[in-house]
From Swiss-Prot:
Assembly: Homodimer.
Any one Gene Ontology cellular component term annotated for this protein: cytosol
Source organism of this protein record: Citrobacter koseri (strain ATCC BAA-895 / CDC 4225-83 / SGSC4696)
Gene: lysS
One GO molecular-function entry: tRNA binding
Coiled-coil parts of chain: none
Name this polypeptide is given: Lysine--tRNA ligase
GO biological process: lysyl-tRNA aminoacylation
Cellular location(s): Cytoplasm
Reactions performed catalytically: tRNA(Lys) + L-lysine + ATP = L-lysyl-tRNA(Lys) + AMP + diphosphate
Length: 505
């Protein structure tokens, strides 16, 4: 047996022995009739204590004689004979406990406390003081075991190092990784901040179906499920767009939804099949109004959550404080491929030749607009590091967007890029029912030609448009990618609590 295999076998043996010992301790607690008590109540969390009392000197704390109760997980313990120091971790952070044998009821220190394990959940009561090193601590007068942990924590110095284990056992990642905990706190703050921002601008939050008879609102491959009661195949939604615009037809002039979308596509550092989007629709507005709204939203979130408008990300710093750059799609192609003759982007054969020269395989179903879009994605997208709006998307790749009044081959649409990736997509909505019907038919033709991401024909949505959709603008923002930016995370799995994973066999 190799040394590595021997070490692995020893580790398994050690773990099995520890599991056995911990279960024996739980059995003893069961015999005492109190394995999982539920009558302990705390009055503070660790962050509240630090915020209120870190600035006070020990003499002041002694004079105030403040008694508190806390609860959390025992992360470290230093036993020094008749006294010990414990680090207790709760939702707000960590607080130190000073546990002395003679300050607890008889037998608690030696017969109970010393037999507890790291990872156990404790309740503690006592008075605040500061150690000689100035650390805020609780001098315990009561200490109780609230939950016995049957499995040990990850190594306290190295945490959960295996990346896949972090995703599969997110609970361990959250216990042992301060950075991971902070990421999801920031995510929650972003969600709350978006809602506050939207409501402040007069939008109403709504919910639309997650299971749909016809998936629409985006070009993507859907998941298929079956409704037993209706004996009907249905699709998990790829976007809420068409339902939200039905609500605008119905008279709700400003609506938004934050919820999950599902796309049966690949997994990467930027893509998870199940992801969170915020979509909004605003009557009597156009895409330019949404550009202003998007800038304001990101600037507000950065200032409110991070306290600044400059957001560090890897080697870059995104500046949300200054006006975002705005380029048309063709301007972006020219900027990042200077040799491009702009006239070639107006000719199918010339554009196809450019695409093929940079390694793009042009499909038979593609028209000029799709080819130009593919060229943009290949030569320009990765260079859009600072916040940038790209406008004038071809109508061919924008089946739900309003055509431009001057050039009907393009639409009043933008996509929003930061760090070389798309974060949001917005446009003036197509409200011409006949034009929409024709574009749906074009999508059907593309699907029949082999494009499995082309949209379905949604007759009911066309009927809704025939009742009259006011001039409207719509915007979708990927929440997961937004959180990545605000938390300096470089894979989408780091900002989704439970990302899609292949089951362990």
């Amino acid at each position: 047996m190799s040394e590595q295999h021997a070490q692995g076998a020893d580790a398994v043996t050690d773990l099995n022995n520890e599991l056995k010992t911990r279960r024996e301790k739980l059995a003893s607690l069961r015999e005492q009739g109190i394995p999982f008590p539920n009558d302990f109540r705390r009055d503070h969390t660790s962050d509240q204590l630090h915020a209120d009392f870190d600035a006070k000197e020990n003499e002041e704390l002694e004079a105030l004689n403040i008694e508190v109760s806390v609860a959390g997980r025992m992360m470290t313990r230093r036993i020094m004979g008749k006294a010990s120091f414990v680090t207790l971790q709760d939702v707000g952070g960590r607080i130190q406990l000073y546990v002395a044998r003679d300050d607890l009821p008889e037998g608690v220190y030696n017969e109970q406390f010393k037999k507890w394990d790291l990872g156990d959940i404790l309740g503690a009561k006592g008075k605040l003081f500061k150690t000689k090193t100035g650390e805020l601590s609780i001098h315990c007068t009561e200490l109780r075991l609230l939950t016995k942990a049957l499995r040990p924590l990850p190594d306290k110095f190295h945490g959960l190092q295996d990346q896949e284990a972090r995703y599969r056992q997110r609970y361990l990642d959250l216990i042992s990784n301060d950075e991971s905990r902070n990421t999801f706190k920031v995510r929650s703050q972003i969600m709350a901040g978006i809602r506050q921002f939207m409501v402040g601008r007069g939008f109403m939050e709504v919910e639309t179906p997650m299971m749909q008879v016809i998936p629409g609102g985006a070009a993507a491959r859907p998941f298929i499920t079956h409704h037993n009661a209706l004996d009907l195949d249905m699709y998990l939604r790829i976007a809420p767009e068409l339902y939200l615009k039905r609500l605008v037809v119905g008279g709700f002039e400003r609506v938004f939804e934050i919820n999950r979308n599902f796309r049966n596509e690949g997994i990467s550092v930027r893509h998870n099949p199940e992801f969170t989007m915020m979509e909004l629709y605003m009557a009597y507005a156009d895409y330019k109004d949404l550009i202003e709204l998007t800038e304001s939203l990101f600037r507000t979130l950065a200032q409110d959550i991070l306290g600044k408008t400059e957001v560090p990300y890897g080697d870059e710093v995104f500046d949300f404080g200054k006006p975002f750059e705005k380029l048309t799609m063709r301007e972006a192609i020219k900027k990042y491929r200077p040799e491009t003759d702009m006239a070639d982007l107006d000719n199918f054969d010339s554009a196809k030749a450019i695409a093929e020269s940079i390694g793009i395989k042009v499909e038979k179903s593609w028209g000029l607009g799709r080819i130009v879009t593919e060229i943009f994605e290949e030569v320009a997208e990765a260079h859009l590091i600072q916040p940038t709006f790209i406008t004038e998307y071809p109508a061919e790749v924008s089946p739900l967007a309003r055509r431009n009044d001057v050039n009907p081959e393009i639409t009043d649409r933008f996509e929003f890029f930061i760090g070389g990736r798309e974060i949001g997509n917005g446009f003036s909505e197509l409200n011409d029912a006949e034009d929409q019907a024709q574009r749906f038919q074009d999508q059907v033709n593309a699907k029949e030609a082999g494009d499995d991401e082309a949209m379905f024909y949604d007759e009911d949505y066309v009927t809704a448009l025939e009742h009259g959709l006011p001039p409207t603008a719509g915007l979708g923002i990927g929440i997961d990618r937004m959180v990545m930016l605000f938390t300096n995370s470089h894979t989408i799995r780091d900002v989704i609590l439970f990302p899609a994973m292949r089951p362990v066999k």
